[in-house]
Structure formats: C-alpha cells, structure tokens
C-alpha cells in the first residue's frame, strides 16, 4: 500500500523487483534463441574464424602436417645443393643428359591440375556436387598422366639409382615427390568416393575437399622447385 505521503523505499524496492522479473521474462527467450542459433550454426571449413565460429583444428592439423613435409623436402633440396656445390662437375661426367620435353609437359599438366581442382572446390561451395565430381575426376586423371609420364622417363633414362651421386639424388627427389603425388591421388579418389553419398559434401561441410586441395597445391609447389633445381640449373 502506498503511503499518503508518497511512495516509500519499500514500494520502490517492490517495483524494482517486478521490473527485473518482467525484464528476465522478456530477455530470457531472446537469449535462448540466440544461444540456439549459435549451437545450430554450421561452421564453414576454410574460414579461419566465423562470426560465431572457432578455428577449425582439423585444418590446423593439415597445415602442421604440410609444414613437417616441407621441412623434409627442404632438407633434401639443401643436401642436393650442397652436393652440387662441392662436386667439381655437376652432373658428373658421363651422366646422360636429361630431356626437358617430357618433364616440361608433365610440369604443365601438374600445375594446370591445381586450377582444375580449385574449380571443384568452387563448385561444392555452390552446392554443386556434380561439378565437384567432374573437376576432381579431371584432376585425378591429370595426376595419373603425370605419374605415367614420370614412369616412362624412368624406364628410358640410361642411368640407375647407383650410377653416380647425381643419379641417386635424381631418383630420390623425383621418387619421393612421386609418392606424394600418389598419396594426393588417393585423397582425391577418397573425395570422389564419398561424394557419391548425397549430401556428404555441401556448401557448409566440405573439409575433405579443402584438405585434398591444399595438399595437392603443396605437391605442385614442391614440383616447381624440384624441376628448377634438377632439370634447369
């Protein structure tokens, strides 16, 4: 009851309690809706941070793996350059001259495959699963052609692994890279196999696609460095 002299402190306290209760009743559903929206929001792979998302630790793991692989190749390239600098002649006398035509064509095929593969990722970002399958299928075919060209080169080279130091370096570097191309092909084929299931990849869920593409780009960059060091210098 309000005093004839006006509202008392108790009245103010009671009114404040009622006002706070009303505010809680109004705000609580709004907060619940926002929280539900956060929980139901789908993180899009490829974005380091979303509006409500967090870093994708799976992609972080892929990047760490590629950093480790880069360190291995860096060690191999460094060893190759050291051997080259300390030898009186490089390649050593008697080493068959490497042909540039086939490796050059192979390089164009492998580098072009990265652009083709990116079209596949762009397709799935538009929920175009058929486009993903088409472009990744072409990329796989280009990777197989690259490996076939490399095997053809091996069979027609007039030197073996133990011919001399240059031959050993050549086979180790190109062979190790070839293993990485093979692994990249397996990743691409895995994506193609999984894409047969409707809805497995979509605009908001395509981590496997991005991981395979990132690995393939890594393989391409390594080949460019290898081609320059071994074939051109």
Swiss-Prot record:
GO BP annotations listed: aerobic electron transport chain; aerobic respiration
EC code: 7.1.1.9
Membrane topology per record: Multi-pass membrane protein
Signal peptide: none
Chief place of localization: membrane
A cellular component term, taken from the record's GO annotations: plasma membrane
Any GO molecular function: cytochrome-c oxidase activity
Keywords: Cell membrane, Membrane, Translocase, Transmembrane, Transmembrane helix
Transmembrane parts of this sequence: 62-82, 98-118, 135-155, 172-192
Subcellular location: Cell membrane
Catalytic reaction equation(s): 4 Fe(II)-[cytochrome c] + O2 + 8 H(+)(in) = 4 Fe(III)-[cytochrome c] + 2 H2O + 4 H(+)(out)
PANTHER family noted in UniProt: CYTOCHROME BO(3) UBIQUINOL OXIDASE SUBUNIT 3, CYTOCHROME C OXIDASE SUBUNIT III
Name this protein carries in UniProt: Cytochrome c oxidase subunit 3
Upper lineage: Bacteria, Bacillati, Cyanobacteriota, Cyanophyceae, Synechococcales
């Amino acid at each position: 009851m309000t005093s004839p002299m006006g509202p008392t402190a108790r009245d103010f306290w009671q009114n404040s309690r009622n006002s706070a209760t009303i505010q809680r009743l109004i705000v609580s559903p709004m907060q619940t809706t926002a929280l539900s929206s956060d929980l139901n929001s789908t993180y899009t792979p490829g974005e380091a941070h979303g509006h409500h998302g967090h870093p994708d630790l799976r992609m972080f793991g892929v990047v760490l793996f590629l950093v480790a692989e880069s360190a291995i190749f860096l060690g191999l390239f460094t060893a190759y350059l050291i051997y080259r600098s300390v030898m009186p002649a490089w390649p050593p006398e008697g080493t068959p001259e490497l042909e540039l035509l086939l490796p050059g064509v192979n390089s164009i095929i492998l580098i072009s495959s990265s652009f083709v593969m990116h079209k596949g990722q762009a397709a799935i970002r538009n929920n175009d699963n058929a486009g993903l399958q088409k472009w990744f299928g072409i990329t796989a075919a280009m990777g197989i052609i690259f490996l076939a060209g490399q095997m053809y080169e091996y069979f027609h080279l007039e030197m073996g692994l133990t011919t001399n130091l240059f031959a050993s370096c050549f086979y180790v570097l190109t062979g190790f890279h070839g293993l990485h191309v093979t692994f990249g092909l397996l990743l691409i084929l895995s994506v193609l196999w999984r894409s047969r299931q409707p809805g497995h990849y979509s605009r908001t869920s395509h981590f496997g696609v991005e991981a395979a593409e990132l690995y393939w780009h890594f393989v391409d960059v390594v080949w460019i460095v290898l081609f320059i060091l071994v074939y051109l210098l």
